[in-house]
Amino acid sequence: MFRQLKKNLVATLIAAMTIGQVAPAFADSADTLPDMGTSAGSTLSIGQEMQMGDYYVRQLRGSAPLINDPLLTQYINSLGMRLVSHANSVKTPFHFFLINNDEINAFAFFGGNVVLHSALFRYSDNESQLASVMAHEISHVTQRHLARAMEDQQRNAPLTWVGALGSILLAMASPQAGMAALTGTLAGTRQGMISFTQQNEQEADRIGIQVLQRSGFDPQAMPTFLEKLLDQARYSSRPPEILLTHPLPESRLADARNRANQMRPMVVQSSEDFYLAKARTLGMYNSGRNQLTSDLLDEWAKGNVRQQRAAQYGRALQAMEANKYDEARKTLQPLLAAEPGNAWYLDLATDIDLGQNKANEAINRLKNARDLRTNPVLQLNLANAYLQGGQPQEAANILNRYTFNNKDDSNGWDLLAQAEAALNNRDQELAARAEGYALAGRLDQAISLLSSASSQVKLGSLQQARYDARIDQLRQLQERFKPYTKM
């Protein structure tokens, strides 16, 4: 169903999020780093970190090229939470996001938010390598590196830190202007920041590799992936972007390799979901996707069973993207027949059906899906099929429940707004659109839409009270966010 919702935006948030980091402590029996205390607490509480994270996530949604694909979002969050469940010092909820960017990179920021570039799927040979990058970023969060960086900058150069935070936001809206501002702001203190960053990167490797191993992934994947990055830097005139934001001296690679060698060797097979996610990312979100994806699918077709199935899925996806619906259906059919409850296959089958104006076929298939009640991806697919099939009330029934349980999913609010518009429920359409604006950090517009919704219902009604209460909540949120909007 995501084909109808896909966006193509251009923005970046990368280098700003990894500046000025200071090495903290980690109390683990397998780690030999000294305990440097918890001094970040004197600058930011966990609650403040989460509030700042909420603010920046909203800016990210509103400005960055997020891949708001339900299947990929579900996959990276499932993989991420598997890693988080084996991490120590977890003090915040975690959320994982995917940005459409052909540069290899990832970053973590306040409140347990981790962002991956789509290029990581292209360069990760297996699931353990992708997980190694995520474990590294998770470790930045659990060690509170960014909070400690803020403390150090406030102590040594407070105006530099305030300027850097302002540049982060500017970089979201205008990458060139934002990075130019950031470069100027940091010019006077760059060398100290780089040394801190190197120390933090090495610590995130050391802790991340433990998380990786405890989660059942191959610890050798981390040094192997780092070595790939170094090789690319050696033989390219332009190093990978991740090396600009995550310093990688030879000593860091040697340390990661030494630590992995001390761990029990593991033979780990990548999950089928990894191959399907990689095929989907390359097939839909890679600028050079046609030839690159075809070459990879040819290779997978000769591989193990999981790779072969992913290759067939990728071929069907390619055909669908080219509007060759009959070919896509024929290619997908054996997979769907073998696994009729597979969400990846059901999602693609829905897109094929809707592309051929066969909404009723999609509806009947999805209504009988085994995991419909528990799988958000299938629920969104069914709601979208109802909407495309001219049954907006059925769609609204699903989406009202969905948005109640998934308040941070803009896909749900967008579809609900479409359904309410088709039903001529103007106030409810405005309210749903307001939630989408709020998620994207556009609180003024959200409040304006809710005010319009409130004016269209009966004076003194329960519905009006609900709209007015939501307006009050958003105004309170604006007040909490004011310190960040002034940076």
From Swiss-Prot:
Subcellular location: Periplasm
Note on how the cofactor is bound: Binds 1 zinc ion per subunit.
Pfam families cross-referenced by the UniProt entry: Peptidase_M48, TPR_19
UniProt keyword terms in alphabetical order: Hydrolase, Metal-binding, Metalloprotease, Periplasm, Protease, Repeat, Signal, TPR repeat, Zinc
Required co-factors: Zn(2+)
KW Iron (keyword) present: no
Repeat positions for TPR: 309-342, 344-376, 377-409, 427-460
Keyword Lipid biosynthesis set for record: no
Binding locations of Zn(2+): H136, H140, E201
GO molecular function: metalloendopeptidase activity; zinc ion binding
Active site: E137, D205
Family recorded in the similarity comment: Belongs to the peptidase M48 family. BepA subfamily.
Entries under PANTHER family matching the protein: METALLOENDOPEPTIDASE OMA1, METALLOENDOPEPTIDASE OMA1, MITOCHONDRIAL
UniProt-recorded name of the protein: Beta-barrel assembly-enhancing protease
Higher taxonomy: Bacteria, Pseudomonadati, Pseudomonadota, Gammaproteobacteria, Enterobacterales
